[in-house]
Amino acid sequence: AISDQLTLNPLFMALYLSNAYIPGRGTFYQEIDTLASGTFAIYDWLTDDLQMISQPNMRFVEPLAGRAEKKRLNELVETFMDVCVSYRTKLPKLLSLSGGMDSRCVAGALQQKSIDFVPISFLDFQKEVKDDVLIASQIAELYHKSHNVIQLSLCEPEHYEKLFYLKAGLNYLPVAMFLQYLEKILAQYPQSALFLTGDGGDKVMRYLLPDKELADEKQWLNYWYSQNAIIPTKDSAAIFGIPEKAMDEYLLNHLSTYPTGNYNYKYASAILAERSARWAFEGEDRNRYFFRSET
């Protein structure tokens, strides 16, 4: 098995335990990684030659100070609408609709552009999301659409095992119930579908800059841990037998690759490039085991 030839890195494991993802990396293994941010690849089919260059500045763009907020908002709306229009396809379009603003915005854009879609939601076994389902039903009624509500049962051990198998532990196990949701949708649409979600909207809809000025790397590090660490780094480091300082040094070294000297923008960029790209991507990748999924 290929796993027998790979090396688990204790530092990466500790970072994952504290952050729920590994900043700047895609796996726990020393030998396997994802492409660096802003990577461009050119492949020559005739010579079987692959060339790659990384230009992080293409991904980490500092906001232009002084521009009117209304103009920025108009640009965001225009871009958002263009993306939604790109989903005009012959595949059935299923919008996983919750009570949140994110998926509601997608629903509004599709409706405005006369792109047909099926609003679909799940009701968990404990009925903890019943208020979300109620709001989603009201939105569906407003748009004169039939709301497909999928009832979930209590998760079985095989759902957790399947999620671990599919994502090798890189997707949070408590979301195993989402596999049941996807399986039931696939049973209704066995010929495939386009599955749309509002995942990641919290990176667009809210203010990403820190609520206080960060003047240096120490302030950045302390603020990052206070806002994002799930498990204290001291505990994560102890579990995997590494110095806590190693985690700090890794994060700061990775942060130094961001093409900006402003620590406030470094923080916002980290939320987009790390939490969004590492955490949200794994859920998106999970969905694509079942059908085409976009967010």
Can you annotate each of these PLM segments?
Residues 9, 22, 243, 258-260, ...:
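Short linear sequence motifs
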Residues 13-17, 163-164, 267-272:
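Short alpha-helical scaffolding segments that buttress acidic/His motifs in well-ordered protein cores
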Residues 1-66:
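N-terminal segments that mediate ammonia production and transfer
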Residues 45-46, 59-267, 277-279, 283-295:
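ATP-dependent adenylate-handling active sites, centered on carboxylate activation for C-N bond formation
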